[in-house]
Structure formats: structure tokens, C-alpha cells
Amino acid sequence: MKHAALTLAVFLSLAACAPKAPDGPPRPNAAGLVPLPCGLGSLRPFSTGYCIFNRNFVTPQARDVAVQAAAAVAKQYPGLVVHYMDASGPDGHRPFAPHLSHGDGREIDLALFYTGADGHPMFKPPGLTGYRNYEPPRPGDPVMCAGQSGGARDPDPPVSRHWRLDEARTKALVEAVTRDPRVKRVFLEPHLKLRLGLRADGKIHFQGCRAARHDDHLHVDVL
């Protein structure tokens, strides 16, 4: 027990002491990557585990994109926090398990926004990881991978689930990300693109049926 506590303390110390330029963002490591913020700003990890286990490394440009998008949405919705999940490891190797991509520091998973069943906004998605809070197609919505499930295509959640997509805040996040010229593309399920009324600007893509569902998070790919 003491050993586990000591190990956790060391991880926390390392995460807190990433080298920084004077009055600026962290300095890139040997792979040219920097950690995403782990503090209390408008961009935060969904769980401290993403920082402790070094799953939050990105290029300096990708960091700027995420920080600025979060700030833009927080300006529109004061007090809002954008939560990130997996980005890349510090070594820059692809692919970054369990993903089919990630790893080079140019890709970040951002959580969508939710309300409770009562309609009140949730501060962060339910669950332990930020993933798998799926918002399934409604009747009449496009269904891209009908009949496919398993590791890549998990089944829909029950109708009785205690969360629902917060469409206004999620749309604001997608628009803040896609309007940045440094963003190459984002992955989002077609039924959410249609439901949110997102314009076809060439950046919002369907990831295919081999990859994980993207109606629980936004995958951002930076140039």
C-alpha cells in the first residue's frame, strides 16, 4: 500500500513538473511533443490518469488548437470546461494503443457535452474514462454500420440511460474546433453532424466501420 502511494506521488510530481519555457507553454521533449494542460483551466483532462500515465502529449500546434478552442467555447458558455481524453504518448510512436491512429501528437479526443435525463447540463460526461457515452441515431437518422458491433462498433446504450447529448454546447465545441485553419479534420458520426446542423465544410468526416464509434467523443486531427 505504501509502495502504491509512493508511486502515485512520483507520477503526480512528474506531471506537475514538466519543463516549461519562462512564462510560456511547456518546452517540447525530444520527440517534439508537449503535454496538454493538467490544471484547472477551460481545458482539462477527463481524469488525472490521462496526465499521470502520459497519454496527453501533443505537438505545440495541437496544444494551441485545443487550448484556444476550449477558451472560445468557455467565452460563449461561462464556466464551461472542455475535457480531453487520449492524445499521444511522449515518444510520438504510432499507433497509440488501443487506437488505430493517435501517437504522433496531432490527434486529440475531446469529450462531448451532456445533460442529465432532467435536462440539466452535466459538468463532465458520466463514467470513468469519458468514452462510451454514446448518443445513438434517432428514427430516420443515417445509420452507417447497421448490424455491426463488438470491439469497434459497440451496441447502443439503453433508452433508459441517464444522460443525453447537450446539442448546443457540443455544436459550439465542434464549430470552435473546425473553424481553426490548423485543424485538418475531425471524426464525428454522420447522424450527429446532421442533428447538430453542422455545415459541410470538408473537415467533418465519418471514420469508417472498423474504427470506434464517434458519437461519444470528437476526434481532432491537427495539421
Regions found by a protein language model. Give the residues of each.
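Hydrophobic helical h-region of N-terminal Sec-dependent signal peptides
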Residues: 6-14
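Extended, low-complexity, intrinsically disordered C-terminal regulatory tails
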Residues: 65-97, 185-207
